[in-house]
């Protein structure tokens, strides 16, 4: 790591508004479809944003997927209600829009396609013929916006109950409970809800049996210890063999994206911790970075290193729980108790720095809540001296155990092609041999200044490989923390910028203008310039991202939260068909997910 962070060469600010006309893919699209076929939107997302006609969608998607360096992953797909948006200068007329975020691993570049829709014609062709993982994203977009995807294999609700009325992310849908009638659960309504939860195989294209025997349909969850949360998987069984299965999510849905439209840019920060409740400050990182792009804020070097330090502490904390519970799922109980001892040491350190444990809500727009306290370095030093020996003991006692290896090697295995098709990120993707970690591929918060390695598998992602990669990731996080300890820069813990929220306290106590700004930003919220921004990070479970749209207000016009666990659970049927029920338990333990991350 660079010892003097202030000597770094100045880079182009991440928050510049750009149209990316110099990106090669824009030229490739214009050569194929003509120079006037698209509208290119200038944003602060950091990726080309191209509006295309609905009739061109599948053709453009197919073209991008077949380029010499193809766009092989559908990273995200969702919608937006454009009807109340006032700042749309130069954009096609639209009541609603759908966006498609594609990634090219070979180019290390993205592109975002947008389709404009009229309120009286909310139809767009399904993308599932090109990218199978579009299935759940299209279901969610229909569920929350009412946009129909023609040709979808089973367009039904996924987040809301099947009996729900309306589409919650529309602007005319109430955001507060007080705008609804009081909730009542009559016996008739309870019976209706229970009937809606009854699984009907025919609705999913499943047969109830063959000529010789019937299949069993079994509910695993939504209350089952191996489901790791409120999560149901309906299994179609031939004996103990899984013929097919249907993951059923949404039981933990809290309307996190809708809340983003009602909270100020500042007051939404505590909600980000709870998207994936084990990640703590890791979840705050993409949100505050995306807001800082909108605001045009470049934070001090000290802030970057503090943020990295807290993020890596929470990464270790999450990985320890994942590894120990995986071992427990396979059948060994003891390691999980030892891991909680280690995690307590991390919580003691986090609490000393932030004042909180699991959900600090400590990152701020333009910095962090306060400076590091006295003695933080001693606590971190003690943890760094403690953890490597403990990690070695886990590996020797449990992870190298022949029974565990035999139980997990070759189970739920898939290759690079399948991982990319299903939008898999994190250790699941890297286990297939693809070296893609956002901290290295697209550094943020100063990660480019740290010396660490990215563990990569040998070509097949199975349960054992995924776990062992996480073990090595733990070692690399310890390596990063060592550099944070030895090279913490001096300087302020907040940026000197009008939109830093709250403003630095020293000025608030001395200048009436800053005091007024503090009052307005905390009570009403800071006003962000009208624009769009995007930030992805390498979170604990894969790639997490925030796509924010500002209409020049104190609140976000649209907050899109893309989480890795949502994509990973959609892959379950493809990875587990033909396996045993006991293999499914091992597979679920190896994914590393929590349902809050799935359902938001």
Curated annotation (Swiss-Prot):
Membrane-spanning segments: none
UniProt-annotated location(s): Cell inner membrane
Pfam families reported for this sequence: Complex1_30kDa, Complex1_49kDa
Reaction(s) the record says it catalyses: a quinone + NADH + 5 H(+)(in) = a quinol + NAD(+) + 4 H(+)(out)
Coiled coil: none
UniProt region (NADH dehydrogenase I subunit D), positions on chain: 214-600
Location of the region described as NADH dehydrogenase I subunit C in the Swiss-Prot/TrEMBL record: 1-190
Enzyme class label: translocase
Protein topology in the membrane: Peripheral membrane protein
CC per GO annotation: NADH dehydrogenase complex; plasma membrane
Keywords: Cell inner membrane, Cell membrane, Membrane, Multifunctional enzyme, NAD, Quinone, Translocase, Transport, Ubiquinone
Enzyme Commission number: 7.1.1.-
PROSITE patterns in alphabetical order: COMPLEX1_30K (PS00542), COMPLEX1_49K (PS00535)
Keyword Membrane: yes
Gene3D superfamilies: Cytochrome-c3 Hydrogenase, chain B, NADH:ubiquinone oxidoreductase, 30kDa subunit
GO molecular function terms listed in the Swiss-Prot or TrEMBL record: NAD binding; NADH dehydrogenase (ubiquinone) activity; NADH:ubiquinone reductase (non-electrogenic) activity; quinone binding
UniProt record similarity statement: In the N-terminal section; belongs to the complex I 30 kDa subunit family.
UniProt function note: NDH-1 shuttles electrons from NADH, via FMN and iron-sulfur (Fe-S) centers, to quinones in the respiratory chain. The immediate electron acceptor for the enzyme in this species is believed to be ubiquinone. Couples the redox reaction to proton translocation (for every two electrons transferred, four hydrogen ions are translocated across the cytoplasmic membrane), and thus conserves the redox energy in a proton gradient.
Subunit and interaction comment: NDH-1 is composed of 13 different subunits. Subunits NuoB, CD, E, F, and G constitute the peripheral sector of the complex.
Name of this chain's protein: NADH-quinone oxidoreductase subunit C/D
Organism this protein belongs to: Escherichia coli (strain K12 / DH10B)
Gene encoding the protein: nuoC
